[in-house]
Amino acid sequence: MASLKHYLNSVIGEAMAEATQSESCNANVITSSKPGFGDYQANGIMSEAKRHGMKPRDLAEQVIISLKQSLPSLIDRLEIGGPGFINIYLSDKEIKQRATRAIQEPTLLIPSAEVPIKVAVDYSSPNLAKEMHVGHLRGTIIGDAIVRVLERRGHTVIRQNHVGDWGTQFGMLITYMEEAVGANNDLPNALSDLESFYRDAKKRFDDDPAFAEKARLSVVKLQNGDKDYLSAWEIFIDESLRHCETVYEALDVTLTRNDLDAESRYNNDLSVIIEDLQGMDLLAESKGAKCVFLPEFSGKDGEPLPLIVQKSDGGYLYSTTDLAAIRLRQKMKVQRALYVVDARQSLHFQQVFAVARAAGFSDQDLSLEHISYGTMMGKDGRPFRTRSGDTVKLAELL
């Protein structure tokens, strides 16, 4: 069934076409700005009357007379307003009946997409080194709402939970686990409070140079596929995902482990991204880092603003992973890729999308869209910081 506005446009447009003896007319139905003007208002009378050499009020009267002969049950009454608008008052009884039907048979009142497409929605995306906190609430809820709406309208939706499960922080955590916990079998108990575990590990990393160096070596071993380190990493990730699943269950969101699009998925693609950017002459070096400079991006000082894709020490960044993910979604023949991330990342996504286009990682058939929302702040008016210890855990809040 069509939306109310679409339905009213059709009904009144047909009556206007009959009155003007034309093939079609645009009723231009809008939501009324004031209750005294009805629920909706047909504003197309003015322009159509002028087009057919009629007085607006005369055309409005003819339309109302025509409709009254077989007034749809949805419309309670029609009135002429001003120089020739038609104020439309809906039937409360019919609205109640439609609302009841919407609850009992929702598919009848929600129009399906005329052309269903494949959509990837990237949302929630917590860092698995830590517990989810209240700052994750908006992205998770907004993303899941978008997913449900798109699916209800008939689109094929690919949920993408782009969790952070890789990087230097995991070398730090594995090293701390070795010292503080010992055998991997003891990890579940030690990780019952991920937040405290992360803060303790970070403090040790900051205060003890020997520990920090050992943590860096752990990262290398992890990246090189050392079995013991991979085993510890997998146990940590599994336990962290359990924390996330507790939150998702409490929120009644539809994300499952099958929807994971983890950073580690792209490990083997990142060097290829750099090689391809180099082959297209898009890379430039700045202070040892590899960057892409596009003319449409500049800083406040007017200097070109780079998208850094590889650090001077050879490490990769979120931008590199995002480019690899875009290329994968292109191969998956996704037509829209939505990124539900807070507004602070607006420039990041503008640059990533532009570089993806310039490099040919995505074409015009793939729409890349950042769905932004406001940042949740702490009492100090700043974004939450896990290491400060004052973050509200989402599981506890719920």
Feature-to-residue mapping (PLM):
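Charged, compositionally biased N-terminal leader segments and the immediate start
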Residues: 1-29
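NTP-dependent nucleotidyl-transfer catalytic core
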Residues: 17, 23-42, 47, 52-398
